[in-house]
Amino acid sequence: MYLNVGGVPPRAAKVVPLVEVCGALTPSTMLPLGTKAPEFSLPDVVSGDTITLDTFKDKKALLMMFICRHCPFVQHVKNEIAKIGKDYQNKNVGVVAISANDAGSYSEDDPDSLKEMEDELDFTFPYCYDETQEVAKSYTAACTPDFFL
């Protein structure tokens, strides 16, 4: 996947931390600006399809949102998260949400509950479950919500 920033011809997918909104006790870290976007392969909780970085290869950019259902910060902005998907679906920008919480510790974040959240908010983008938290770790997403562009 390639990202075109500032009119520069695309070379390689780069991660740009867009916004860092985290709980006061959980510091968020960022990958260095310009880091190649880590590959991922995760199930969409709604369709069951496997979503990868390559899924968005024809998009101008990809917004990755690490969110979950139980987080009070996500609850506060969940309608705006849904609106982002609707606003950008026809602008050639890919959007994906990923939940990496342990469903054993947070039952509200199991795949069935995530699907209910997607249904409730009518997401227009895939909502994936990162059961092993490997994708979140590769992006250094330490809390929710964490946004990467």
Question: Language-model segments: what does each one mean?
Answer:
Residues 3, 16-54:
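N-terminal "domain-start" segment that seeds a small globular fold
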Residues 115-146:
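Short, internal strand/loop/helix patches
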Residues 73-88, 108-111:
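Typically the conserved alpha-helix immediately C-terminal to a functionally engaged Cys/Sec
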